[in-house]
């Protein structure tokens, strides 16, 4: 007999991933000192149970040392060169890499060589090829790699996955996901930014925010994409180089579920995820932005319920999960192989938008930024690793 919805959502924000015997502290080095690191990551770690920020790494010594004042636990401010040289390597146990997408690889490679656990922002890199190199570097060094899909530790998303798994909404049939924001008007009001440079970003909208409904659908369904179709449009010339200001894409999952996802970097800020099954539906709205009061609605049979629950900081949950897995000598998830599925799916989405046809995941053969061009971007001093992203 399947559990009732009231049983599954009891203690809605419970940390089902946390064991009773977890003790200790993981010391974290922040790689990249942009606004996300300063305003979100460092405060989230400061509020966590199992980790603390001890090292910050930035483009200049002055900036790095100045950032040591952000919290008392920070003891070292390093330049990127000093990080690569292994300076103060004994002062941290793990790194959080939050540079532009196309610069993740060199910092993860260094962290792996130093034997440090890695929490790397999503997407893994600006191209599939570089993402594969990143995963291989951690595998060779036998260091844990977790990719920062913070929705996977968001309680509303975890409860949604449990409800789907328990069959409360029957067999999943459709997923509708959406995420939009006004990038140039409200987030980063500068057209000369890394998100609009295809060599550094890999793409503006699918790679930055379209990834949220894609990966969250994967997690809730416990399924992987096998085929996609897509349409992309550009209205603002600032997006011409990347080619995807607004995007709509469809996904066929290996369990038979169909998804329709939309994303825009120039539309009203909004996010939602809806899963419709043969016997019911669940909806999370707003879904993806941190520090917003999440709504959760479940409809099943002839009943419906809106759940009011204590809100959490998604970043604090993510860091505590990562640290708790390291402290219990367990592999953190989602890992690099999981993230590579998204990289290949997004590659296929871009190819589908360009060709106007369905594309099988793993068979995109697209013209996305290759390793050489991304290496060149990394060598460009104008590509500031402190211009972080999520």
Curated annotation (Swiss-Prot):
Pfam families: GFO_IDH_MocA (PF01408), GFO_IDH_MocA_C3 (PF22725). One of its GO terms (molecular function) is oxidoreductase activity. Its EC number is 1.1.1.424. SUPFAM superfamilies: Glyceraldehyde-3-phosphate dehydrogenase-like, C-terminal domain, NAD(P)-binding Rossmann-fold domains. Its main location: secreted. Residues 364-373 have a biased composition (Acidic residues). Residues 361-390 are annotated as: Disordered. Keywords: NADP, Oxidoreductase, Plasmid, Secreted, Signal. It is found in: Secreted. Induction: Transcriptionally up-regulated by both L-arabinose and D-xylose via the pentose-specific regulator XacR. It is an enzyme of class 1 (oxidoreductase). Residues 1-22 form the signal peptide. The keyword Secreted applies. Disruption phenotype: Impairs growth on D-xylose as sole energy and carbon substrate. One of its GO terms (cellular component) is extracellular region. It catalyses: D-xylofuranose + NADP(+) = D-xylono-1,4-lactone + NADPH + H(+). Belongs to the Gfo/Idh/MocA family. NADP-dependent D-xylose dehydrogenase involved in the degradation of D-xylose, a major component of hemicelluloses such as xylan. Catalyzes the initial reaction in the xylose utilization pathway by oxydizing D-xylose into D-xylonolactone. Homotetramer. This is D-xylose 1-dehydrogenase [NADP(+)] 1. It comes from Haloferax volcanii (strain ATCC 29605 / DSM 3757 / JCM 8879 / NBRC 14742 / NCIMB 2012 / VKM B-1768 / DS2) (Halobacterium volcanii).
